[in-house]
Amino acid sequence: MAKEQIAVAELVLNMILGKTGGTRVDYFPQKPDFPFDAVYEQAFVRATPESQGISSDLFAALLRELDASKDTEMHHFMALRHGKVICECNFAPYPKGMWHITHSMCKSITGMAIGMLIEEEKLKLDENIYDIFPDHINAFSKIFRPVITVEHLLTMTSGVTFNESGIVSGNDWLGSFLNASVNGKPGTEFQYNSLNTYVLSAIVTKRTGETLTEYLTPRLFGPLGITKYYWETCPKGITKGGWGLFLCAEDMAKLGQLYLQRGKWNGQQLVSEYWIEISTARHLKTQNGTYGYGYQLWMEQRPGSFEYNGMLGQNVIIYPDMDMVLVTNAGNKEMFQDCIMLNIIRKYFPVNYHPADVLPENPLSYSLLKRLCGELENGENNNRSTSLRGRWKRNVVSRRKHSDKKYSYRISAAVDRPSDHHSFMRAVSGRTYVMEQQNIGIAPLFVQVFHNNMTDGISEISFTYDAGNFYVSFTEGEVIHKLPVGFGRAADGCVDLHGEHYLVATLGEFARDENDIPVLKLEITFIEECVKRKVHIFFHEDNGIEIRWNETPGKKMILAGLSSITEELSGNFLYNSLLGDHNITTELLHRLMEQTIEPAVRGYLKSSKETDSIDTDE
């Protein structure tokens, strides 16, 4: 196996075996806290949909369908026409004005930087990347390498085999990319690879002496009034380029509006018209369900339209013929353009749809649209069931044999009074449980892997009821995450992951499962990210708890991303030996990964000396 495959195998193995800690990539805290106090600059003018030629009823129907679909998990939506915001909705618990991870949507911004660099005559499309970085590859190896140009990186046709999975293999991503093997002839086949974009970012740094973020701040972000953003770097200090950017929805809309305006903003030409033209042209066909690829952006279904696209639902859709921009942030379970969310949007803006210049104002329809957005923002229009039944598989775990019937009765009785959750809170308050398996983190695996911020493992969970507020505390490594829990509406909190602070909103519900066992259901939303932690805590009669962990988007996405690796590992003798079995099949490996992604663990009461003093009676 190649070095990067070995590294991925090692990561997967450590997860399966329950090992905590870091990877082969050096970790350093870099994410700043969200700048709440920063003044937002250059906000768009707000207008009614009708004043810009579109019905409020259309947006109301679109938002209802996006919210109701079981295949979508909407976070933010914004629509602009003629440079004015005509619809905006933030789905609970995601607040207005909060930055959001963009994933690959930011590739299009890196493409803009390359266009600027070419306009400044510091770079050419046909330059060989091996000539740009002569010190990163030895002369002998270079003789046998094909020419890979800047344009090949822009169109995802480099053929380089070092891809996203390789970033866990070490700190030198640029060197690994330049020395990796090449599949086929560069420029002939579309092979989506985020490391192509990373190398484009490295080229900006090589030619300017600045990181991509530093280069773009005075040329793009500053002129657009974009002040609330952060872009991660690799261990070598190179901006990731193809992922790792946090950006607000309205600022995403500015980047779309900039292209609608042919690169001009407030009278200043930020991106050349030539680059707008060439980057938004289809340079090659792509897989089924998509419409072609330009320079770091995708073509859309509507003729002349295009899109900045990031996985799980981060999109800026530009419709030049309608002078319109749509922005989405979501946590869908799908990649790229062939997804339910975009198909719903295409349904409301089909090829034959042509909005009017202006429509008569409709105060009633507009009022209903605003009410709907308010309900969605407050979580009052949630069409998704939170029922336990049929959604969580039961796992067999060992149980301790001590019992406290009085405590168990009080917990059970409290759940039987759904109108009085305070009795349940009092029943569990002050109790701390020690985890028998201590390798699970508060952050979803998506967050841990994408930010190279791996868990130290949760060792204890405790409950506190104080002054009418309920808290669940998770002891992870040396840090205690004390999260306020809201019932009916998520409560805001924060977790500290090795010096990086992530804002969360925690929603709770007391219920019983199909076996009549009392359960506390927690949904911990990482509001700057695409993901949620789902934690179900079952209170058993033996005075212990069982905790079932899940995340969304979860198992399906993670297993799909690891499919090629697990298939190869299943037949690898060394890997089988490490797992203690010389006949590990792909099916068994997938089952082990499923249990790793959705574990069930047991906790036992740390001290029961206060049990008899707990009183849940009114």
Where do the protein language model's features map onto the residues?
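Active-site-proximal alpha-helical segments within enzyme catalytic domains
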Residues: 196-203, 241-264, 314-331
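N-terminal leader/targeting segments and the immediately adjacent pre-domain N-terminus
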Residues: 1-95, 118-123, 363-436, 445, ...
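Active-site-proximal binding-pocket segments
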Residues: 216-217, 221-280
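Active-site helix/loop module of the DD-peptidase/beta-lactamase fold
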Residues: 120-158, 179, 210-243
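Substrate-recognition/cap regions that form aromatic- and gly/pro-loop-enriched pockets
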Residues: 432-554, 560-567
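Active-site Gly/Thr loop motif
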Residues: 276-328
